[in-house]
């Protein structure tokens, strides 16, 4: 069977599984779980992959799952990534009544996409004609939430990072992966699939580091003798004002964002607050900008403590690396070519390369950036949702677009990358220059945290 016929067989296998793929997306939507707690979703995914006859590895990064589909060679190995976790938005009408979890970022769609790829590759039998392998990865905890609880897991030695992909990297599960493919859902779009245009580097997402901050003062009676206390809340307020005063020093091109909230503001209104805790994220477009902002923030925090005679404890937490968008032009071309081959042109939008010298990345973060720093990665946008992402208004309104169409693009790319001795995949890996080596990843993060 020639290339065209085999590829058509693969795409037809996706269409034949459309109802099953949609059912998977619906099941995961109805069973949302926050990061590192996705036990039901992991079990559900494991069951489907095993029913396909695949050998499944479980409990990676606590709840992660992966299964490898072998072709004629073990390498190159392409990872198709789906994210297991949901957000916590109890105001959403379809959130879990007990936990408040809901898939208001569309990760249930990613999981349906990844499951669909496994179904189509196995059903079609095309891997017998392809020179490489595909690893279907279900990764936990993309959303950096419940940080205090995750720090408890760190203290227990169960985690080092906040993100599931980072745990996969740390534990070596990306060591035999050569290329990664991912996507993300958008809302209120006229298009159905969005692919990157242009050549060369383009701005992507920012990275971040986290901070857990504790101001320590001394309690006293708020009304009778407040002068006998040291007000930790006042120290925190001065520190936050000092951080705000630093914002003019952040370059626009660095896309710095410093945001925080108070997780403990005191114990009682008639007691001078003796301990105040904050949770903070520092986002920026480069590691250097993250370090610079972190230094300025720490200075402000210490200044607030000194002003009130309090003490402050600052714990730096590894976040996610900034995106490296230079990647591989051959990989981006493969994505565009497949999109136009498989879909109607009116269903697509192609991003254009930004010719301006000032190119500001968007402010969202994801641990897929860490993957993109160590290997070639391509992501595309998916429509089919409405409302505001990360909010109570989010919903999926076109399940075929959200759940099935991305499977076809993944399938087409995998086929082309591994066809004919995997020439295209090998070109992609030869073009790519890693920003961080897999073996040096942990040391790189430790250097960031130490400033």
Q: Could you tell me what each predicted segment is?
A:
Residues 76-79, 133-135, 178-181, 347, ...:
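Structural motif
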Residues 28, 67, 80, 107, ...:
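Divalent metal-coordination and catalytic microenvironments
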